[in-house]
Structures are given as C-alpha cells and as structure tokens.
C-alpha cells in the first residue's frame, strides 16, 4: 500500500469549490507534503437539498473508501462538511459555511445533527473564515483558518474600463439581482450599462445579460468593469468581491448574513488607515443606488485604487495562504 501525507476528499460540485480544492492541494504540495486530491463522482440530480446532500455524501464516501484502499495517508481532509457527513474514517474538515447556516428547516433536517457530531469528532477544522466557525456554533475542536487564495487575473488592472458596472447572478435570488437592478435603474446615466454575468435574460436599455461564462472570460469582463456590485441575501465567503479587488475593480455591496469574509475588508474594518476599499450600503434602491453612483464617480485614479485594493487583500494572496498552510496547517495535520 502506497504511503501518502495528506488525502483530500473533495466534492468539486461547483467551479468555485473545485478551484478552492485545487488551491489547497497546491499549497500542501508547495509546503513539501505528498498530497493527493480525489473527488466524488457527480450523482444524478434530485429534487430536494436534503436528498442532494445525501447523494453527494455517499459519493464522497465511495471516493474516500476507494482511495483509502490504495493508500495509507497520515491525514485525511474532507472538503466541505457534506463530504464529511458519511466519512469512512475521521479527518480534518475544510468548509466555507456549515449546514447550520445554509440548510435551514427541512432543507437540513438530517445534515445539521450529523454535521454537529462530525465537527466534534474531527481532529481539526479548516474553515475558510472565522465567521464559519461562529455560524457552526463555535465548536471546541482545534481549528486553523485557511482562506481561499485570490490573485490578479492575467492582464491585471490597468486596461480600459469600458463597462460601467458588472454583477454576478448565477443564483439571482441569493445574489440579490432584483436589488441590484432596482438600484441601477435609479441611478444609471444614459450611456452606462450594467452587465449581468452567469445568467441569461432579456436585455434592455442599460442592462445586458452575458449568460454563463468560463472563468477566464468572466475575469476578462471584470477587468473592463469600473464597478462590481452585489446585494446578496446570504454570502458564504465573497470570492467574487475579492476577485474584483484583485483586478482593481471598485466593489459595492450590501451586508449579508453568513460568513462573509470579504465584508470587513470592504468596510475598512481592521485597516491600518481605517479607510474602506469598498462601498457598503443597505439594500434599498436609494441607498444601494447612491453607493453605486459614488463608486462610479469616485475620482481616485484607477491605478491608485488598484494598488490600495491589492494591499487590502494581502491576507488572501497565495503567498500569505501558503505560509499559513506550511507553518500552521501541515504541522497540525501530520502531528502524531
């Protein structure tokens, strides 16, 4: 049986999750670990969230069992609490948000109690943000916070900003597209256009739907946008907001429940100069619209803003995350 330092059992159910799993595996490899990432096979689609999670948990268990039969890892990391629900053996749990927060009522009827047990039994928790621990009930299990790394995209900031505003709305209700559209209608000027990525819809004056995009094409749009605006009803991390900052795009957002890792940074909480790099407003059309207008009319030079934004996201850059993985996470994973 082959030896292995770390086995990561991932779901890979979304692009964002696959990217986060790849980043964790890459950080472990750069830290000198012999790490392997395996993913669950996508199950057939079912109608309810509770059954969907069961199908994914069973698929993750199968992937773990098959890999454990071939290798003897010193540590196992389950990527998401769903992957850990039916684990064949205990391991560290990597998660952005617990079912306690994003599976209310009947949607999490079986997941929440099993999740609480797994978070108690795990040797280590690896949340992406401290807010995820709070939402999980502040379990006493040892934890290491490891953010998702964010870097400027190829091309970076500095190009032509010929799109006034961009929003991402693959889940329009959760992302608050209705709020964004109402605010946009209240403040847009005749020559300004909002591009809606991740969704198809009827174009109208001032609003254009870009549909589903691959990630490189989306980041290319982001580099062209002056403002990224979002009004989420719940936010489990805020990776799109961090990517916007990485590409020098001004960010407008509303507060939202959930472990919204990007929100304190956007609001200037903890900043040395106390200055926010984003515009945070209530979701009413008047308040959100005023924030969008202020961001669009911001007189700060684009290059100066891009430098400030990059400095603000320093804790989320790959080099910082690699240090955390090498100095804090890996020693705890491999501790006898």
Go through each PLM region and give its residues:
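A charged, aromatic-enriched C-terminal amphipathic alpha-helix characteristic of glycosyltransferases
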Residues: 54, 58, 283, 287, ...
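Active-site proximal beta-strand in glycosyltransferases
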Residues: 77, 82, 86-106
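Membrane-proximal helix-turn-helix segments that form the acceptor-binding/catalytic region
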Residues: 106-128
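Carbohydrate-associated surface elements
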Residues: 131, 149
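Conserved donor-binding/catalytic core segment of Leloir-type glycosyltransferases
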Residues: 150, 156-175, 181-186, 194-195
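Aromatic "clamp/platform" in nucleotide-sugar-dependent glycosyltransferases that forms part
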Residues: 233
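Short hydrophobic beta-strand element within catalytic cores of glycosyltransferases
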Residues: 250-254, 260
């Amino acid at each position: 049986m082959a030896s292995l330092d770390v086995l990561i059992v991932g779901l890979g159910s979304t692009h964002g999750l696959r990217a986060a799993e790849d980043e964790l595996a890459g950080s472990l490899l750069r830290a000198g670990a012999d790490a392997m990432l395996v993913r669950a096979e996508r199950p057939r689609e079912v109608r309810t969230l509770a059954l969907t999670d069961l199908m994914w948990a069973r698929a993750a268990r199968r992937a773990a069992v098959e890999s454990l039969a071939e290798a003897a890892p010193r540590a196992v990391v389950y990527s998401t609490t769903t992957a850990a629900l039916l684990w064949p053996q205990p391991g560290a749990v990597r998660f952005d948000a617990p079912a306690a927060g994003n599976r209310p009522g009947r949607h999490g009827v079986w997941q929440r109690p099993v999740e609480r047990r797994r978070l108690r039994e795990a040797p280590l928790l690896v949340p992406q943000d401290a807010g995820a621990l709070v939402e999980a009930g502040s379990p006493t299990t040892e934890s290491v916070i490891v953010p998702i790394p964010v870097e400027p995209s190829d091309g970076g900031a500095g190009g032509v900003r010929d799109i006034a505003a961009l929003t991402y709305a693959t889940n329009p209700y959760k992302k608050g597209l209705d709020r964004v559209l109402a605010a946009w209608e209240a403040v847009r000027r005749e020559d300004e256009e909002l591009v809606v990525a991740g969704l198809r819809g009827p174009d109208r004056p001032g609003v254009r739907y870009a549909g589903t995009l691959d990630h490189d094409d989306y980041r290319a749009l982001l580099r062209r946008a002056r403002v990224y605006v979002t009004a989420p009803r719940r936010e489990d991390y805020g990776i799109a907001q961090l990517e916007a900052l990485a590409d020098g795009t001004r960010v407008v957002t509303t507060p939202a429940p959930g472990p919204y890792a990007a929100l304190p940074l956007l609001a200037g909480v903890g900043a040395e100069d106390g200055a926010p790099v984003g515009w945070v407003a209530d979701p009413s059309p008047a308040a959100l619209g005023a924030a969008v207008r202020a961001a669009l009319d911001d007189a700060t030079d684009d290059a100066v803003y891009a430098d400030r934004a990059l400095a603000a996201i320093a804790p989320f850059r790959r080099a910082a995350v690699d240090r955390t993985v090498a100095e804090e996470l890996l020693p705890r994973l491999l501790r006898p």
